[in-house]
């Protein structure tokens, strides 16, 4: 790993059975590594995490509808992966690209993902720098300071982890070009 790896960014997204890490669980995890300029360097494993039917049946209507339509529930039922196995596969990938503690967690609403990581994938949670690079912060600022630009960027909202990461990277590129003045 070269010195530039210290500037690489880890993009992560989780899909969960709900929003409460005390009762809900992770059902999908994906990662992408970019350079500091947001060019994709590597796509990590995209992993459906097995959860029992008793847990899946407790999901709210939005989760059931969304994750049935996108095929995730079926992938979760077919999966044999535990959260720990998914965590270890993700860490094995990240260790090839980014030094521990050098990258913030990157994505949209990453504080929510981090809550689940601390609960169910603590070794992965500890791999990140303590800072966050949260694209949703820029979205909220644009909504307040320059709302007209929000109509120029649309997301598919497939609610599949890898798609969501790619959209987050593209969204940050959009804000860099149309919202943040870098000169």
From Swiss-Prot:
One Pfam family hit: RNase_T
Enzyme class, first EC level, given as a word: hydrolase
Protein name: Oligoribonuclease
UniProt cross-references to SMART domains, sorted A to Z: EXOIII
Keywords: Cytoplasm, Exonuclease, Hydrolase, Nuclease
Domain Exonuclease: 9-172
NCBIfam families in the cross-refs: PRK05359.1
InterPro entries, sorted: Exonuclease_RNaseT/DNA_pol3, Oligoribonuclease, RNaseH-like_sf, RNaseH_sf
Main localization category: cytoplasm
GO molecular function (one): nucleic acid binding
Enzyme Commission designation: 3.1.15.-
Localization annotation: Cytoplasm
Gene3D superfamilies per the UniProt record, alphabetical: Ribonuclease H-like superfamily/Ribonuclease H
């Amino acid at each position: 790993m070269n010195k530039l790896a210290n500037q690489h960014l880890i993009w992560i997204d989780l899909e969960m059975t709900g929003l409460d890490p005390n009762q809900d669980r992770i059902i999908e995890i994906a990662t992408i590594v970019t350079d500091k300029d947001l060019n994709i360097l590597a796509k990590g494993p995209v992993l459906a995490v097995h959860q029992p039917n008793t847990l899946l049946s407790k999901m709210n209507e939005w989760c059931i509808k969304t994750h049935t339509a996108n095929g995730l529930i079926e992938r979760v039922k077919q999966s044999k992966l535990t959260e720990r196995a998914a965590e270890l596969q993700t860490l094995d990938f990240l260790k090839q690209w980014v030094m521990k503690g050098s990258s913030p967690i990157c994505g949209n609403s990453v504080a929510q993902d981090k809550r689940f990581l601390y609960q169910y994938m603590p070794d992965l949670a500890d791999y990140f720098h303590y800072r966050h690079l949260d694209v949703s912060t820029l979205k909220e600022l644009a909504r307040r300071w320059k709302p007209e630009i929000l109509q120029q960027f649309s997301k598919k909202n497939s609610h599949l982890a890898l798609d969501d990461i790619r959209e987050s990277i593209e969204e940050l590129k959009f804000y860099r070009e149309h919202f943040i003045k870098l000169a």
